[in-house]
Each structure stands twice: as C-alpha cells, then as structure tokens.
C-alpha cells in the first residue's frame, strides 16, 4: 500500500521569538488527497509548537505520544523529547513509524527524527519533509541577510519550498511564540 507523504515544516528562532510553519498538502502517490491539512499545532496550554512530516497516521501517533510525555514531564520539552526518543528506539511498533517532528517552546527548538534521534538545530533554523531542504536553505539565507522576523522568514521559506517541491503547496499555517 502506498504511503501518504510529502510536506514541508520549517522553524526559525531569532532572539526571543520562534516561528514554526507548514504547508497543507497531503499526497498519496501522485494524487493530492487534501490541500488544507493542519500539520502545525499548539499543544501543552499553547506553550509548545509542534509540526510533523511523514506518514499521516504515524505522525498523529507520535504527536499523541509526545503530548503525553510533555504532560508527564510538566512541559519540559527536552525531557519529553528524549523520553519519546527512548521509547521510539525500544518499542517495536514505534520503530516502524515513518514520521518526524519539530518541536519548539519559548527557549528550545528540537527535531525528533524517524530514527529516534533528538537534534538541537544549529543557528535556530530547521526544516523537515520533502521540501525541507529548500525551506531550510531559504530560511538560512534570509536569516543571515535580512532583518525579517521569524514569522516572515518562515512564510517566505514555505513560499519558496512550495514553488520548488511538488509535495508542498501554498496553504500555510504558521504559529509563533514571542
């Protein structure tokens, strides 16, 4: 059976502000199944942003588990991510999930990979998904050469990724913490 795939999620942190955004396209093979999916959300009393890429059902399963870890560790983003990664590596069912997450709170941004790794991105910029490389390159160039806000950088990066990646559209959801 073919997998649902393709999206772009990008996060930019600058100073005391962070923005996390994603497109809305869900693709099954070469068919666009939905154009307005919401892959970026606020969780834990609106204090944590999370964006997901990969298999849709897998991503929702990981998101649910991450939220449970966040509750268990009273909003400690790093601890919740590390605990989820431990489970991911040791649980046979979790190891089969094909998804990635970007999480961010007021102080920290983390990427949780499909291998169960937790990465702290360099320079406060990270992106995942099929258009992630385009978005990350654009975000990095904009961050280094402009005074745009994180939200503006995320918006422009997603626009560029949507122009270049066939699995990324121009329906964007962007959340910020300031």
Curated annotation (Swiss-Prot):
Domain of life: Bacteria
Regulation of protein activity: Allosterically activated by HslU binding.
EC number: 3.4.25.2
Catalysed reactions, semicolon-separated: ATP-dependent cleavage of peptide bonds with broad specificity
Keyword tags: Allosteric enzyme, Cytoplasm, Hydrolase, Metal-binding, Protease, Sodium, Threonine protease
Active site: 7
InterPro entries: ATP-dep_Prtase_HsIV_su, Ntn_hydrolases_N, Proteasome_sua/b, Proteasome_suB-type
GO cellular component, one term: HslUV protease complex
Compartments where found: Cytoplasm
Cystines in this chain: none
Binding site residues for Na(+): 162, 165, 168
GO molecular function: metal ion binding; threonine-type endopeptidase activity
Pfam families: Proteasome (PF00227)
GO biological process: proteolysis involved in protein catabolic process
Function: Protease subunit of a proteasome-like degradation complex believed to be a general protein degrading machinery.
Family affiliation: Belongs to the peptidase T1B family. HslV subfamily.
Assembly description: A double ring-shaped homohexamer of HslV is capped on each side by a ring-shaped HslU homohexamer. The assembly of the HslU/HslV complex is dependent on binding of ATP.
Protein name as annotated: ATP-dependent protease subunit HslV
Source species of the chain: Burkholderia multivorans (strain ATCC 17616 / 249)
Gene: hslV
């Amino acid at each position: 059976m073919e997998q649902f795939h393709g999206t772009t999620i990008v996060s930019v942190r600058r100073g005391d502000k962070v923005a996390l955004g994603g497109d809305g396209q869900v693709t099954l093979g070469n068919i666009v199944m939905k154009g307005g999916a919401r892959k970026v959300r606020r969780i834990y009393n609106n204090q944590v942003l999370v964006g997901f890429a990969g298999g849709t059902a897998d991503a929702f399963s990981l998101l649910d588990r991450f939220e449970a870890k966040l509750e268990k560790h009273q909003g400690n983003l790093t601890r919740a991510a590390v605990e989820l990664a431990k489970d991911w590596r040791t649980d046979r069912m979790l190891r089969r999930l094909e998804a990635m997450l970007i999480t961010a709170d007021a102080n920290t941004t983390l990427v949780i990979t499909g291998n169960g790794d937790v990465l702290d991105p360099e320079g406060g910029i990270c992106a995942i998904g099929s258009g992630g490389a385009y978005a990350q390159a654009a975000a990095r160039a904009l961050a280094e050469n402009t005074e745009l806000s994180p939200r503006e950088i995320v918006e422009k990066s997603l626009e560029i990724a949507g122009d270049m990646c066939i699995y990324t559209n121009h329906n964007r959801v962007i959340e910020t913490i300031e």
